[in-house]
A protein has these predicted regions:
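Short Gly/Ser/Thr- and Asp/Glu-enriched loop/turn motifs at secondary-structure junctions
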Residues: 22, 84, 300-306, 333-337
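Conserved PLP-binding catalytic core of the aspartate aminotransferase-like
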Residues: 281-282, 291-325, 342
């Protein structure tokens, strides 16, 4: 046996991770460029200190207060409201997704998504021994509903993963598409990943509105993006209570630390302030889309806090040229395309200047 005794299908695989480079302008992992205010920081510090007093004890494994606060927050996006029994949380959306596949995927079961899609999905499937099947999106990155429905009926997946807005394209799904796939899935789960949901354009609804109609629908969110809490690592979902109960079977004991719960509650108390920058980022995003198109780029419509643009004969050369000028973006998505996060006005000015310089050099 080869040492170490790693599972054979994992040998030679590089760990997931975007480059973490120390450059002046970092626009590669879709973080919120605006940190919390001094008042929010003070509340977080006080809350963490209070939690530290009882760190010799295990935390509330049912995180009752946090579930109630998350339910209140999510209720803004659906007339039916959300109750705490419909909420689950974990250490980032990554752990939420992994728990879903641990509970509802596994050997002999299939997970489906539609490429281009979030690059971690097949890894969740691999790590849970769930068969992975990827359909294709249309050329404009929208979902070909007829083809998607046919794939679901053919593969009979236990879990369908639908990011909306999609990463890396920024494309949002219409509610009719989500509803039709919920019906086509039968008893399979339809997981709508709304990590970037708060950035969607005016009039684009959340899949949360569909929860009363479909017992197999799950909607996931995160505090990493709009809440400027990437360092917090708190993801959560809304679903039927029986789905949340099922996840309890696979969760690790006391998986959410007392400090994580306290800090997340503090952040939720400052939700209006933390989300106040979302409108500014939307404006910056829409201006970026217009500018890139004026520069002759193909640009995907975006409801997220990033923009996918192309098409480049050698996208790596463009990425490297930007990096050489102190701007880090992401080399991801379909061949020939690049993804840039929306930053502050100064960061976007630096990106535009660098891309103009790179284009001039390549002309």
């Amino acid at each position: 046996m080869t040492w170490p005794p790693l599972r054979e299908e994992l040998r030679g695989i590089e760990p997931y991770g975007a480059p973490q480079l120390d450059v002046p302008v970092q626009l590669n992992v879709n973080e919120n460029p605006y940190g919390p205010s001094p008042a929010c920081i003070a509340d977080i510090a006080t809350s963490a200190a209070e939690a530290a007093v009882t760190l010799n004890r295990y935390p509330d494994r049912e995180f009752v207060a946090l579930r109630a606060a998350l339910a209140d927050y999510l209720s803004r996006d659906t007339p039916a409201g959300i109750v705490p029994e419909q909420v689950w949380a974990a250490n980032g959306s990554n752990e939420v997704m992994l728990q879903l596949l641990q509970a509802f995927g596994g050997p002999g079961r299939t997970a489906v998504s539609f490429a281009p899609t979030y690059s971690m999905y097949p890894e969740y499937a691999r790590d849970t021994n769930t068969r992975w099947v990827a359909g294709r999106r249309a050329d404009d990155f929208s979902l070909d509903l007829d083809a998607a429905r046919d794939l679901v009926k053919t593969e009979l997946p236990s879990v369908i993963l639908l990011p909306s807005p999609n990463n890396p394209t920024g494309t949002a799904l219409p509610p009719e598409a989500v509803g039709e796939l919920c019906e086509a899935a039968g008893d399979g789960l339809v997981v709508v990943d709304e990590a970037y949901g708060e950035f969607r354009r005016e009039g684009v609804p959340s899949a949360l509105e569909l929860l009363p109609s479909y017992r197999n629908l799950v909607v996931t969110r995160t505090m990493s993006k709009a809440f400027a809490g990437a360092g917090l690592r708190l993801g959560y979902l809304a679903a039927a209570p029986e789905i949340c109960d099922a996840i309890r079977v696979v969760r690790l004991p006391y998986h959410l630390s007392a400090v994580t719960q306290a800090v997340a509650l503090a952040a939720l108390r400052h939700a209006p302030e933390l989300l106040g920058k979302v409108d500014e980022l939307r404006v910056e995003r829409d201006a970026l889309v217009i500018w890139l198109r004026d520069e002759g780029c193909d640009v995907a419509d975006s409801d997220a806090n990033f923009v996918l643009f192309g098409r480049f004969a050698d996208r790596h050369a463009v990425w490297q040229g930007l990096l050489d000028r102190g701007v880090l973006i992401r080399e991801t998505g379909p061949d020939g395309w690049l993804r840039v996060s929306v930053g502050t006005p100064d960061e976007m000015a630096a990106f535009r200047a660098a891309l103009t310089d790179v284009d001039g050099e390549r002309a």
